[in-house]
């Protein structure tokens, strides 16, 4: 919900910063068909070349240190989670060793040391993404262009948000949801839909004044000029189905936080423009 996609890091900018050479970029296979994106190839080669750039980067730079301090609320968990995902072959976090799955502090500390370099690499990628994004936004705004950011209501089950904040979601002891978000049958789909995302425990979120949502909104306000809230109606009432359901026919409607959450978000939104969907 907070991190940027390293796929969007402009490698040419890394060349300008002296972290890469053009010949190094051309030495990788990025696909041969301009109309077809080979994401598997990009996944492997993108991270290989970003690691080359990281090997020449100084993690002691003032800008980098300022970014990591400012973003620490989410960056440390995200970087550890991403490093662990790669270390364990990209399997879902619910299948990790139980101590890590359950964020046992001794296990977390051990892997923070083991994967220190990988964790710093993840922080480097986020630093480069956000630096470039803010430069792009500034350029667009200076020419009268505003950016609309799409913010979905739910997050994926296999995500750092769920791993690091299990208490905020309706989950089984092993971290897997027994109910997931979906859509009831309607004119567009007679069988309904199963989205697969875990649903929030709104009662728990309310206890700290929806702090996670406020932080999420503040982060998005920096990135975009207008925020589009996808599935806004899910804040009023939401539809869930069994996690193993094949379709959305046999679901259940529940009451959402409604005005309690929107009032909390208004506290941080100020004059921010929002599109509701």
What positions do the PLM features span?
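Alpha-amylase-like alpha-glycosidases and glucanotransferases acting on alpha-linked glucans and related
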Residues: 2-130, 155-277
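Conserved, well-ordered alpha-helix/loop/beta-strand core segments that scaffold catalytic motifs
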Residues: 122-155
């Amino acid at each position: 919900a907070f991190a940027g996609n390293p796929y969007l890091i402009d490698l040419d900018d890394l060349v300008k910063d002296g972290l890469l050479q053009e010949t190094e970029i051309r030495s990788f296979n990025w696909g041969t068909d301009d109309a077809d994106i080979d994401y598997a190839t990009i996944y492997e080669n993108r991270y290989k070349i970003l690691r080359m750039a990281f090997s020449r980067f100084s993690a002691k730079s003032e800008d980098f240190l300022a970014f990591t301090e400012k973003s620490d609320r989410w960056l440390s968990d995200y970087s550890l989670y991403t490093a662990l995902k790669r270390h364990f072959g990209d399997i879902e976090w619910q299948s990790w060793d139980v101590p890590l799955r359950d964020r046992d502090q001794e296990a977390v500390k051990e892997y923070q040391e083991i994967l220190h370099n990988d964790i710093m690499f993840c922080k480097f990628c986020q630093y480069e993404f956000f630096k470039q994004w803010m430069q792009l936004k500034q350029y667009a705004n200076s020419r009268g262009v505003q950016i609309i950011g799409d913010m979905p209501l739910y997050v994926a089950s296999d995500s750092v948000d769920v791993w690091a904040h299990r208490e905020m979601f309706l989950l089984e002891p092993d971290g897997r949801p027994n109910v997931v978000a979906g859509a009831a049958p309607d004119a567009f789909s007679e069988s309904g839909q199963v989205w697969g995302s875990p649903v929030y425990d709104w009662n728990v979120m309310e206890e700290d004044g929806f702090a996670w949502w406020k932080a999420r909104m503040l982060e998005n306000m920096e990135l975009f000029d207008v925020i589009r809230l996808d599935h806004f109606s899910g804040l009023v009432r939401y539809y869930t189905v069994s996690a193993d359901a094949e379709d959305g026919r046999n679901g259940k409607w529940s009451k959402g936080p409604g005005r309690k959450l929107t009032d909390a978000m208004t506290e941080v939104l100020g004059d921010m423009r929002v599109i509701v969907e």
